[in-house]
Amino acid sequence: MANKGPRKHLKRLPAPKNWQISRKTNKYTTRPSAGPHAMGSSLPLLLVLRDLLGYADNAREAKKVIKMGKVLVDGVKRKDHRYPTGLMDVISLPDANESFLVVLDEKGRIKLNKIKDNTKKLCKIENKTVIKGGHIQLNLHDGRNQIVKLADATKAEEDIYKTGDCVILSIPEQSIVGHVQFGEGKLAYITGGKHVGDFAKIIGIEKKQLYPDIITLETENGEQFKTIRDYVFIVGDDKPVISM
């Protein structure tokens, strides 16, 4: 049987729950193309412009604006209206002199926060591998791979990056300009579970072997709760290191 290629259509009703779109106005919606974020954790650029920002009345208008290169994601012009945007992406509209950060609301749905500083972004280290020459490749949450060259690959102390840490990338250069370690006392942004969208400080880490680590956190008003490590996104010490 011949390969039909990737699907190009998506019905509105079974679309990801974190999409803030009307489910019954039309049968189909825009399906995100393959990219840095999975479909379940991203939103196509067309829907960002039309449904979230309201800067276009219909799909035709949104496509026109995008194809003209008037929308930047992490400082790069994206002309594909199906390009998937996801957590911590910085979306800029130079003509309107506006920038937005992709975050999550209290129901885990994708939303945009208006920001003033669009020159850097945070990326979570999901995994890391050793490449030729003993250097380190960081696999980040938004699909990118960042190479860290070590002066002396035989010295383990030169590798300061750990899984769960976050790196600060410059925009649009996409180079590492900072590092926030995972650990107690750090400020975290919660990306899943009952406290999704909240900020809280890590006050305890319970290591597990066969299951995800359990992290105990405390909000600004003193409420304590627990969640798994996968839902913890480090954003700084006492306050976020980027505009949120």
Curated annotation (Swiss-Prot):
InterPro entries: Rib_uL2_dom2, Ribosomal_eS4, Ribosomal_eS4_central_region, Ribosomal_eS4_central_sf, Ribosomal_eS4_KOW, Ribosomal_eS4_N, S4_RNA-bd, S4_RNA-bd_sf. GO terms for molecular function: rRNA binding; structural constituent of ribosome. Pfam families: Ribosomal_S4e (PF00900), RS4NT (PF08071), S4 (PF01479). PROSITE patterns: S4. Residues 1-14 have a biased composition (Basic residues). Keywords: Ribonucleoprotein, Ribosomal protein, RNA-binding, rRNA-binding. One of its GO terms (biological process) is translation. The keyword Mitochondrion does not apply. The keyword RNA-binding applies. Residues 43-106 form the S4 RNA-binding domain. GO terms for cellular component: cytosolic small ribosomal subunit. CDD domains: KOW_RPS4, S4. Residues 1-36 are annotated as: Disordered. PANTHER family: 30S/40S RIBOSOMAL PROTEIN S4, SMALL RIBOSOMAL SUBUNIT PROTEIN ES4. Belongs to the eukaryotic ribosomal protein eS4 family. This is Small ribosomal subunit protein eS4. It comes from Methanococcus aeolicus (strain ATCC BAA-1280 / DSM 17508 / OCM 812 / Nankai-3). The lineage of its organism: Archaea, Methanobacteriati, Methanobacteriota, Methanomada group, Methanococci.
